[in-house]
Design a protein with these regions (language model features):
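Anionic-ligand binding patches
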Residues: 2-115
Length: 115
């Protein structure tokens, strides 16, 4: 995440980078032009992005922070295709889906059961 980057901008940027890397790989391998679909999803509690927990303790802490809270789940998608002719630029389209989710309050025992 870049300093001061909003969650929506972050997920769109990451998805765009995935698309660029995928199109570059197609070109590098000399494969014929084909549509490439990339996506990324992030959860944000306010402006704080919640990444994938690496440990059970992190998962418990994340669920506890979401307990009783309203947060956003954002998925960015991007579709691109290399140009048909050599030197023709790639074309692309992108979009963002944003959903608001409210977790019911969870006890410590309920959080533990999820993990």
């Amino acid at each position: 995440m870049l300093p001061g980057e909003a969650p929506a901008a972050y997920v769109q940027r990451v998805t765009g980078l995935k698309l660029q890397a995928s199109l570059a790989r197609l070109k590098r391998r000399g494969l014929p032009p084909a549509p490439v679909l990339c996506a990324d999803t992030t959860v944000a509690l306010g402006r704080r992005i919640l990444g994938k927990p690496a440990t059970a303790d992190e998962a418990r802490a994340m669920l506890a922070s979401l307990s009783g809270q309203r947060h956003r789940v954002m998925t960015a998608v991007a579709v691109g295709c290399l140009g048909e002719q050599a030197g023709e630029p790639a074309r692309g389209w992108s979009g963002l889906s944003e959903s608001w989710v409210t977790f019911a309050p969870m006890s410590e025992r309920e959080v533990q059961a999820y993990v």
